[in-house]
A protein has these predicted regions:
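PRPP-associated nucleotide enzymes
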Residues: 1-215
């Protein structure tokens, strides 16, 4: 299975600052800051705050539209192979265009002009703005494999199956795992059960598929 790593808001902010200072020191003042949806939008907002210039727009590759301006700065959260950034550049019609990213896989074919940090090996990065979405998906995958899991089994499997250390998870996102479980419960995706003083979770998707009574 893929390996996952969570990053905190403070770490993301430090990457944004690093990228922003590179741009300022380079003397580049873009007319337009193009955020690649959806992760690039959050990074672009912070970077723009430091730059103090540039109109902010979002570019969705699933719904492509040409962007025209004199100078552009393209912002993404993560560059893996570089195909996303390369495809985005085809839609930007500007005299001057520079690229930036918070993180980049070391062996990426695309090297941005401004970069926060490298990833040595491929890892699925759980950014703060995707935390609930990504963790929900992983939890539901685990509950699909077993009828029910208690809190400790769930945390153990997040580590053994996806590399998410429970302690690091709590340090970087205090209380957020409990929030994700609560959200899934409120959405009707999972069921919380208390037995002998312990809390267990069941997937309601699995129960529905099996035709069991949900109560």
């Amino acid at each position: 299975m893929e390996r996952y790593v969570t990053v905190s808001w403070s770490y993301v902010d430090s990457l944004c600052r690093k990228v922003a200072f590179q741009i300022i020191e380079d003397g580049y003042k873009p007319e337009l800051i193009v955020a690649l949806a959806k992760g690039g939008w959050f990074a672009a907002r912070v970077i723009r705050d430091y730059l103090g210039c540039g109109r902010l727009v979002s570019l969705e590759l699933d719904n492509p539209k040409f962007v025209r301006c004199n100078s552009a700065l393209v912002v993404d959260d993560l560059i893996n192979t570089g195909r996303t950034m390369s495809n985005a550049l085809k839609l930007i019609k500007a005299k001057h265009t520079k690229t930036s990213a918070l993180l980049m896989l070391q062996n990426s074919e695309f090297i941005p002009d401004y970069l926060g940090d490298y990833l040595l090996d491929y890892t699925w990065v759980v950014f703060p703005w995707n935390f609930v979405e990504d963790l929900s998906e992983l939890i539901l995958k685990l509950l699909k494999l077993k009828v029910e899991l208690d809190q400790w089994e769930l945390k153990s499997l997040l580590f053994t199956e996806f590399g998410l250390d429970p302690l690091n998870l709590e340090i970087s996102h205090q209380g957020k795992l409990d929030d994700v479980l609560k959200v899934l419960e409120l959405r009707g995706e999972i069921k919380r059960i208390e037995k002998s003083g312990r809390i267990y979770f069941q997937s309601l998707r699995r129960l529905r598929k099996g035709g069991d009574e949900l109560g």
